[in-house]
Amino acid sequence: MIPRAIRSAAAASFLLLACVAGHAEPVVAQRFMVVAAHPLAARAGYDAIRRGGNAIDAAIAVELVLGLVEPQSSGLGGGAFLLHYAARDAKLEAYDGRETAPARAAPGRFLGADGRPLDWPDAVVSGKSVGVPGLLRLLELAHRGHGKLPWASLFEPAIKLAREGFPISPRLNALVAADRFLALDANARRYFFLPDGKAKPAGTLLKNPDYAAVLARVAAGGADAFYRGEIAREIAAAVRSHKRGPGDLVEADFSAYSAKQREPLCGAYRRWKVCGMPPPSSGGFAVLQILGILERFDLRALKPDSVEAAHLFAESGRLAYADRNLYIGDPDFVRAPLAALLEPRYLAARAKLIDPLHSMGRARAGDPGGVATSYGLAEPLELPATSHVSIVDAEGNAVALTASVEAAFGNRQMVRGFFLNNELTDFSWVPEEDGKPVANRVEAKKRPRSSMAPTLVFDEKGKLTMVIGSPGGHSIINYVALTIVNVLDWGMDIQQAIDAPRMGSRNGPTELERGTKAERLAPALERMGHSVRIRPEASGLHGIVRTATGWAGGADSRREGVALGD
C-alpha cells in the first residue's frame, strides 16, 4: 500500500531521495502518522506500524535509520529525550537518555591554563566534549516497557540500508562540504570524501558496513553489546587519543550509564494541557513558561505576522530564558524550584513586566519567593544539530522523540560508522559567576542541560491533540512554543504552523527569520527598542495534530523530512 505522503508528492522524488520540501498542505491519515527528518527513516517507522508495531517500535526503527542517513544530527554516539503516551490507560512517561560527563570530569573542563574559556575548536572538536552516549539505553528501556515487535526486527531496515547503501541527500552533501573539520578524521574522510578531497556528490550511493555490524550486534545482544565490551572500549580509546584534545572517557563510564524514567512536566495553556520533558532538559520548562506568560494576552486579537505579536513573543521568551539560564540543571545535582517558577501567580507577575510599547532589553531572572538560590548565571555555547520524530500509532499511542549529537557531526570523530557527540559543551563553560557555582557547570557523572523540547498537547477532555518537537539548539524552545501558539491560538493547520516565519528572543537580540515576512517587522521592532538580528533559522519541526477524521502531519520545509500516514 502506498503511504498517503507519497500520494501527495512525486513517488520518484521519494525513491531517489531528492531533497523533499514540506507540503503546502498537511498530510492527512485516518489511522496513524509518522513524521521524521528523512524519507527512508519515516518509511521505516511507517512499515513498523503496518507490521503490527506501535509508536515505540516505530520510533526505534526511525531513529536507527536516522543515525545512518542523517548522521550529522543524531545517532548511536549521542543521546535523546522521549515522551510516550499510552492511550489505553492515558499514561504519560518521560525517558531521559541524555549523555553524562565521565567520572573524571571537573568543573574547569573547558577553561584554559589562563582561566579563560577554550577556543571553539579546542573544546568542541576534541575528546573533552564527548559524553557517555545514552540513545541505545533509552531505546531499550522504552522497548522493554512498551514494545510489541521483537527488538531485533526493528534493526533490520537500518542494517539493510547500511549494507546495500543509500543516496547522499542534498542537505547531507552540503553539510559535509561546508565542514572544515570533518576531513581531519580518517574514518570520516574515507566515508564522505573523494580521493581529491571533495565531498562525494548528492546522489552517491553510500554504504556503511561498520554501522551495520554494530547494529547487528546490538540487535542480537541488546544495549549491553554497546555499553559493555569491545565497542565501548574502542570509543573510549578514540576519545582519549584525540589529537586536538584528549578526553578522559573510560570503559567503566559506559557500563555505569543508565537511561532514566522521569515525571513529565505538564502545565495548563488556556483550555489545553501541555506536557514536556523535565530537567535536565530545560525545553519543557521554558516552553511552559513562555505559554504561561502569553496566556495573559489576547493573542487571537492579533495577527500572527504583526509587530505586536512578535513583540509579545520575544518579550515572553526573554523572561523564560532568563529563568532557564539561572535555575535549570541536572536534577540529580540541582534542585530547581519548578513548581514555584510555573505557578500562575508568578507567571502573571512576570507578564506584567512586559511593556506593550517598548522592549525590556535583557531580562533578569525572577524570584518566585521563598526560594533560596546560590547559583551564578552563565550560558553555554550554542551548536544546533538535532533531529525530532513525531509518531501516533493505530491505537492512539504517541511518541515525541528528540535525539542529538549536539553540533553537526558531533565532535567530528567517527567510530564504527557513527559520530561521537560533543554534548558536554552544553554545560556552562564558566563554572562560577560572582563567586557562585553555576547550576549547569561541569561535574562528574552529571547530565548537561538541554533545550530539547519533545511536547504533547491534550484538550480539556484529556484527548491527545498535538505531537511536536524540533532541532535547533537553544532556539528549540522558541520554535516549539511558537508552533503551539500558531495552532492553538491562530488556528493554523500543522503544516502552516511549522512553515510560518520564525521569530523570538533567547534573552538577547530579537531574532527574525531571514527571507520571510518576519524581516519586514525589523524597523518597527527597532523603534520599540528591540535589538534585531535577522538570520536563517535551523528548525526542523515535525508535528501531528488530531483532526475530525484522524491525524494531520507536517514536516518542516527547511529540511528534508516527510510525514507518512495511513
Tell me the role of every PLM-derived stretch:
Residues 261, 383-386, 450-452:
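Short, small/polar residue-rich loop motifs at catalytic or cofactor-binding pockets
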Residues 24-43, 47, 55-221, 226-228, ...:
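Noncatalytic scaffold domains of N-terminal-nucleophile
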